[in-house]
Curated annotation (Swiss-Prot):
InterPro entries: Elafin-like_sf, WAP_dom
Note: A D-omwaprin has been synthesized to permit cristallization by using a racemic mixture containing equal amounts of L- and D-omwaprin. This D-omwaprin provokes B.megaterium lysis (after 45 minutes of treatment), but fails to inhibit growth of B.anthracis.
Protein name, UniProt field: Omwaprin-a
Source organism (scientific name): Oxyuranus microlepidotus
PROSITE patterns to which the protein is assigned, alphabetical: WAP (PS51390)
Molecular function terms from GO: peptidase inhibitor activity
Task of the protein: Damages membranes of susceptible bacteria. Has antibacterial activity against the Gram-positive bacteria B.megaterium and S.warneri. After a 45-minute treatment with this protein, B.megaterium have no visible pili and are smooth. Has no antibacterial activity against the Gram-positive bacteria B.thuringiensis, S.aureus, S.clavuligerus and B.anthracis, or the Gram-negative bacteria E.coli and A.tumefaciens. Has no hemolytic activity. Does not inhibit the proteinases elastase and cathepsin G. Is not toxic to mice.
Intrachain disulfide bonds: C10-C35, C18-C39, C22-C34, C28-C43
Compartment(s) of residence: Secreted
A cellular component term, taken from the record's GO annotations: extracellular region
Length: 50
């Protein structure tokens, strides 16, 4: 049902208009993740902590 998510975390929220670019990590190219920022979802390069 739910596919495993790509590794890494979403970076801080960018200051852009509200847009739905993606539905889930699989709809983003390469290693990018589908990051939810309230009124928008966009593909972003992940950040790694630790």
């Amino acid at each position: 049902k739910d596919r495993p998510k790509k590794p890494g975390l979403c970076p801080p929220r960018p200051q852009k208009p509200c847009v739905k670019e993606c539905k889930n990590d699989d709809s983003c190219p390469g290693q990018q993740k589908c990051c939810n920022y309230g009124c928008k979802d966009e593909c972003r390069d992940p950040i790694f902590v630790g």
